[in-house]
Structures are given as C-alpha cells and as structure tokens.
Amino acid sequence: MTSRLIKKIITGDEIRNAFLKFYSEKFHKIIPSASLVPDDPTVMLTIAGMLPFKPVFLGLKERPSKRATSSQKCIRTNDIENVGVTARHHTFFEMLGNFSFGDYFKREAIQWAWELVTKIYKLSSENIIVSIFHEDEESEKIWIEEIGINPDRIVKLGEKDNFWSSGKTGPCGPCSELYYDFNPEKGLKYVDLEDGDRFIEFYNLVFMQHNRDSNGKLTDLKFKNIDTGMGLERMAQILQKKSNNYETDLIFPIIQKASKISSINYFSSDERTKISFKILGDHTRAVIHLISDGVSASNLGRGYILRRLLRRMVRHGRLLGIKKEFLSDIASVGIKLMENNYPDLKNNNELILSEIKIEEVRFRETLERGEKLLDEIISSGQKLISGFKAFELYDTYGFPLELTEEIAGENNIKVDIEGFQREMDAQKERAKAASSNIDLTLEGSLEREIDLFNKTIFNGEDCLDSEAKIQGIFLDSNLVKKASEGQRVQIVLDQTSFYGESGGQVGDNGIICSTDAEILVDKVVRKKNVFLHDGIVKNGIFTVGQTIKTVVNPAKRVRASANHTATHLLQSALKEVVNKNVSQKGSLVAFNKLRFDFNASKPVSEDQIRKVESLVNSWIIQNHPLVIKNMPKREALEKGALAMFGEKYGDEVRVVDVPGVSMELCGGTHVKNTSELGCFKIISEEGISAGVRRIEALSGQSAFDYFSERNFLVNKLSDLLKANPSQLFDRVNNLQSELINKNKEIQKMKDEIAYFKYSSLHSSAEIVNSFSILVNQIDGLDGDSLQSAALNLTSQLGNKSLVILGGIPNPENRKLLFVVSLGDEAVKIGLHAGKLINEIARICAGGGGGKPNFAQAGARDIDKLDFALDYAKNHLQKSLESYSDK
C-alpha cells in the first residue's frame, strides 16, 4: 500500500521524507537529527548516523524505543582533499538510517531495505549489486532464497570491507551493502566494486551480533542490533540521474549562486574550475550547520575545522575570480535550501552570516599576502617548498599549512612537512624558554620524584582545618628531609584541607603549622593528583613524617567558592540570553574575580549584559540549594550535565547541580546555596581571539566593594560637576557638545593662523617643466593644521603643484609629521602621494600612506628631517626633469 502513495520520488526532500515515512509505518520512532557537536566530550563531531545511538548500542543508555529511524546531519573532514575531485566525497552529508535495539534482525533489515529501494524508490533489480561478509552464510541465504536475487549479483568481501566494529573490542558484526550499477549492460562477469564510475554504494546494513574481547574472541551478544545508513546525497544522484552528487537539488542551487557571482558558467567551465564550484557547494552546507550548532571559528578543535573550511571557500572564490566578499550570499542560499528540514538555520540566520562575514574579511588579507609569496616560489621553478618557508607562511602571514600543501600540490610542488614541524617545535621551545620561571616548574628531582607519592586526599570540602602527615619536602625542586626558617619549599601531604589549583579555580592559601613551627602557604597546585603546598617557613623546622595541621584562609575560600558557583550561573544565563550553543573555552576562578571565556561570533550587547546580570541575580535571590553528588559519567551525561570538550573525565564524576538552573561536571569548591553569593556584577566583556569572547565578573564581597567604589565616584563627580547623580548623564553630554564646538573653533583659528602665516610660501615654489615644487619645514603645527596649510598651498599653486611639508609639532614629544599634496596634473603623470610619503617617512623611521593626491605620515627620528626633505625635493626634481610636457 505504501508504494502506491508516492508515484515518483525525485527531490532530496522527497527522498528523505519517503525514507522516514516508510520506516515510521513499520513502527520505527522518528528521531530528530542530533547536533553536529556531540554530547560526548571525547568526540569532536558527529561523523555517522549511528553516533547519537552509540550509548544505546554499548548498553550505556536506555533505548528511545525498540525501533528508530532518523536523518542525521554528519561532518567528516578526513577526505577533504577529495571534495569536489570525486563524484561523491563530502564534508557535510545527511545519513538516513533505521535502527533496531534488540528487536528485529537480519531478515527484516534485508527485506525492508529491498522493499524500500525497489518499491518506494523504484530502482530496478538489474541495477543493484549486493556485497556481504564472506563468512555470513545467513545473509547470503536471505538474499538468494527470500529476496530472490541472482547469486551472480552477490559479491563476497573480507573483514576489511564488510565487517563493522566499534573498536578493537566491543560490539561488532558483519554488514551487507547495496550498490547501484550505472552500467548494467557491461554484465556480471567482471564486477569490480572499486570501479567508482560504474558502482556507487548507497545503503549499508550492519548486523551487530558479536562482542569481541581483548583476545580477539567473538561471542554472541544477548541482544542483537541493526544499524543502517543510506547517504541522502548518493540516493539523490541515482534518482535524479546526475553524474555526481553536486549537481543534485541538494547542492546545485548553491553552485548556481556562485556561478552567477563569478560570471562563469558552471557547465561550460573546465574541470579545475568545476572543482572550485563543488567545494563551495559542499563547504557552504558544512559551515552553516557548524555555526548553527554553536561552533565558532578558532585555532582549536571544531573551531579550527570551521575556520579551515571557510578559508578554503575564500581561496576557491578567488580562483573563480571573485574579488568581493561573497560567502554570505551563497550561505543564504544554503540556509534557504535546508531551513524547512532544519529550522535552527532560519532561527540562527543572523548569527551564521555574521560569523561567516567576520572570518571572510579577516582571511582575505592573509590570503593575499600569502598567495603573493607562494606565487614567487612557484614562478621560481622550485619543486620543493622548504620547511622554513612553509613555516614563514604560517607564522608570519597566518597561512595554514594545509592551504600551502593544497596550492603547492596543484602546481606539482612538494612541501617539506618534517622541516615545517622542526621549525614549529623550535618555536615552541623558544616560547617555552622565554616564559620559563622557577615558580613550581616540574624540573630536576621534582619531575622524577613526584610519581613516588600517593594521591593526596582532599578533605577540605566542608572542613577548613585538619591533621595531615608530611610525605615529602621539595627545596629548589629537589627532595630534602627537612625545611628550615626562611626557606621556600613545596610540601607534599597525605591529605589536605587546601584546594589545589585546577579546573580554572586558584588554590587556597593559609598556614601549615605544628606546635612550634609555621609555613605561610601562598599557593597550592595539583600535579599528577599530588598537591604541592608552596610557601615560606616563617619559623621552626619541618621534617618528613611529621604530623602537622593545615589551616585554610576561610575568607579567601569563601570568595573563590562564590565566584565558582557564579561562573556556573553565568554560563547558564549566557545560554539562555545569548545563544543556547554557548560553551566554555576557558575560565579563571580567583578570590577577587571570575573570568569566563566562551564561543561567540560578535560582542555581547549592553542589553544582553543587563539581562544576563539580572538573570543571575534572580537565581541568587531565589536561594537555590546546590546539590553535589558523585555518579557514573554516563549517568551524569544522560541527566544533561555539561562536560567541557577535551577535558579528561574518569568513569566516576562529580556533578554540581543547581536544580532547574545549572548542572555541570566539576571538581571545584562551591557555596551551599545561591544566596551566599550576595550579588553578581559583570565588569567587562571583550574579544580575546577570533570567535572567543571573555567576560570578567564579580560576586559576593568583591561585587559589594565594586558598587561602593562606584557610588563614591558618582558622588565625587556630582560635587565636581554640580549636578545630582540622576543629572550626570545629561551634564556630561552637554559638556562634551560644548567641548566639540570649542575644539572646532580652535581648529578654525589654527587653520586661519596657518593660512596667513604660510600662504606667502607659494612664492618660494620652484618651477620644473611647468610644475611647481614646494618642499618646506613648518614646525609647531598639529596634523590637521599642517594638512590645511598643504591644501591651501596646493590650491594657490594650481593643478600642476607638488607640495611636501614636514615638521615637528611639539619639540618635547620628538615626533615628526609629513604631508604630501599633489595637483590633478601631477597625479595624471604618474606621481602618487601615498607612495611618495612612505619613502620620505621611512628615512625618519616612520610610515604612512594615503590617496594618489594626498597623504600623511608620522615618524620618530627628528634628526633626519632635513635629509628627508632634501631627498623629497631631489626626487621630485628628477621625476619632473624626465617629463616632457606635450
């Protein structure tokens, strides 16, 4: 009956909808696509349709239902160099899948797959080839006896091609793949599935039936699972009868837009040009989904993948002759193309286009500089780009190594990757040496001996003083038996009430004491689970094995705990107010403030800042209790606890929960309830790198101190300006307006003085080939006045004038100013004010630039002013002497 509902399926949307409808009618629950950013912090991106179900297959999470079906967006970049080159490699793709969790198995999976492709998609059996694992007799029997497929259409392959596993150990099983034959007339005598022109694999059925142990032994799983995947783009190519995936309706509208912008016809262009179009089509889909799912361009992890894709797009746009910014235009087409199936694209439209524009503008300048240097290397005939030169491109010009390799490869030139890595390592060593210090660096004996100590037990969650035994003493990074008065040492204890610096939170300070000795502890760090208590022995002697008492400074612990809880609340508020995809990129929890770094493509607005503050303060007033529990990591993640990507967690994790507000994996110290924070205030918001913003904020006593100081300043300003606090804004506004007007009047007077004082200078101009040259030193004028004087002199001398003025505005500052002003006729004969002034300023250790008819510059070496002006005059004379006025 289902087959009669759809007469002809052609479009990508129809293919997707038909797949989901088909399996829904077979009692599969339709699961929406998961984010490209997985919940699992150990995985960078969603690379397969089954990834969201991996915890279910591994028995770590309850199944959403016995049967499920989905259209999952995925990204893979391992074959990025093949994108656009082959007919079907992509970074972004959609994987249609049907899944069984301990319900049906091979028979139903094979039967339904066959019904779908032959009855719903109406593929002819004459165009289908099936591969199976060579030991999977059960699948072979089903295909031949129940489906009725010709045995000649079955290809048996080995474990490499037709046996799936999740790793060296764990669930695994054989698979059966369906291939489409574009040339069935060639017959079945020689079937080579590696022939990409003839065959395309479009549906993979994985039968998870075994568990592999560490010895490689296979045992049957108690519950057998089905995991299938059909590439939407590949099925579109087949049903739309296209020669490649890029010309299907899923991607081609983006290519058409790029074709229109570049004024190049896609179909009549050569293969190399088509590759650039295809890369734009593919990468556009990837970047819009990455940004919509919360990824911001950066130099790390997912952010670097996004940046790399965007930079490839800019470059291939340039190869198509597109000189202007264009990525937002083609991204808009991609969003429009997919927003019905992925509404988040429409909701995040502004964010996506903004992020793309920022990155495009930034990279265009980099690309221009790097390409120029690469062009010089290529034109020189070299066949190898040295590691030094590749590193120079990377370090000086910001040119990614992958892009250098790509451009070099297009010109049959190799890159010395090992040499590049050596240069990179050398730079890291230089940076390390430059920033080295003696403050608790793990060097000498400490590096070797730290592993000898057992893990330090932290007992300071609720108790700020406790007894402990000294396990070791480090003096100048070497183990010693005792510590004496005046020595700075690092003490290792068996247990401690001091919190050791980790997770962004600073360590506690306080004292370690015995009956007759005391250490002032000013820093505690954690190295390999061993706490190092760093401090100076105030008096007495401490020895290894001695029992002592640890006493934490309670005031500073309270402040740090308040700031840590405030950091959790801040992240939740940012997710609610700014973007649900906000994620932590770094943090600092200190005694006096907190700092939170997060992904964002643009600054947080003042209105958003106010809303974030208001939300956090409302949670503080509501007196939410904090619930801290240890639990299995999988349980914590299932409950929605936030985990920081890249952070290593054990199987057991500590969860800090503010019910209904925030839940994070965290090992830091916190308050008992939110009201202990008192209040919360954001004091700054700024960008610290591409795609990363930083907020600094205060809570508790620090926030109260901040408000008190601000109140004092407001009162002082009120007295100074003779205005009530509520009138300060208007009063300052009026003063600014008055100041602007006064400055305009002053500048006008300066210009008039300069005009009357220097207007007679035009009479000293030298005539060369009918052009008037005036080069002079004028001191005591600021930039605006010097500019005004030059323009007035040019006006007096006419279209054939060349005026260069230089001078010292203020002798105390020892700085120079230069201006060059050229008449229209001087510009017509090829003279350029911007180039002239750059040459002049460089003589005096300066620089500048400007337009062909006017430019200005600054410089530092006032002793060379006379020489620079003489050079300028001689240069102009020679230029004009060689000119013949026709």
From Swiss-Prot:
Per its record, the protein catalyses: tRNA(Ala) + L-alanine + ATP = L-alanyl-tRNA(Ala) + AMP + diphosphate
Stored CDD domains: AlaRS_core
- Which top class of enzyme applies to this chain? ligase
Instruction: Report the SMART domains cross-referenced here.
Output: tRNA_SAD (SM00863)
Q: Which cofactor does it need?
A: Zn(2+)
Q: Which BP terms in the Gene Ontology apply to this protein?
A: alanyl-tRNA aminoacylation
Pfam families the UniProt entry points to: DHHA1, tRNA-synt_2c, tRNA_SAD
Name a GO CC annotation attached to this entry.
cytosol
EC no. given is 6.1.1.7
Read off the SUPFAM superfamilies from this record. Answer: Class II aaRS and biotin synthetases, Putative anticodon-binding domain of alanyl-tRNA synthetase (AlaRS), ThrRS/AlaRS common domain, Translation proteins
Compartments where located:
Cytoplasm
CC cofactor note: Binds 1 zinc ion per subunit.
UniProt keyword annotations, A-Z? Aminoacyl-tRNA synthetase, ATP-binding, Cytoplasm, Ligase, Metal-binding, Nucleotide-binding, Protein biosynthesis, RNA-binding, tRNA-binding, Zinc
Which GO molecular function, any one, fits this protein according to its record? Answer: aminoacyl-tRNA deacylase activity
What's the main place this protein lives? cytoplasm
Question: Has the keyword Ligase been applied to this entry?
Answer: yes
Top-level taxon of origin:
Bacteria
> Binding residues for Zn(2+), per the UniProt record?
H564, H568, C666, H670
Matching InterPro entries: aa-tRNA-synth_II/BPL/LPL, Ala-tRNA-lgiase_IIc, Ala-tRNA-ligase_IIc_anticod-bd, Ala-tRNA-synth_IIc_core, Ala-tRNA-synth_IIc_N, Ala-tRNA_ligase, Ala_tRNA_ligase_euk/bac, DHHA1_dom
Q: What does this protein do?
A: Catalyzes the attachment of alanine to tRNA(Ala) in a two-step reaction: alanine is first activated by ATP to form Ala-AMP and then transferred to the acceptor end of tRNA(Ala). Also edits incorrectly charged Ser-tRNA(Ala) and Gly-tRNA(Ala) via its editing domain.
Question: Known HAMAP family for this protein?
Answer: Ala_tRNA_synth_B (MF_00036_B)
| Domain statement | Consists of three domains; the N-terminal catalytic domain, the editing domain and the C-terminal C-Ala domain. The editing domain removes incorrectly charged amino acids, while the C-Ala domain, along with tRNA(Ala), serves as a bridge to cooperatively bring together the editing and aminoacylation centers thus stimulating deacylation of misacylated tRNAs.
* Family stated for the protein in its record: Belongs to the class-II aminoacyl-tRNA synthetase family.
Q: What is this protein called?
A: Alanine--tRNA ligase
Q: What is the lineage of its organism?
A: Bacteria, Bacillati, Cyanobacteriota, Cyanophyceae, Synechococcales
Q: Which gene encodes it?
A: alaS
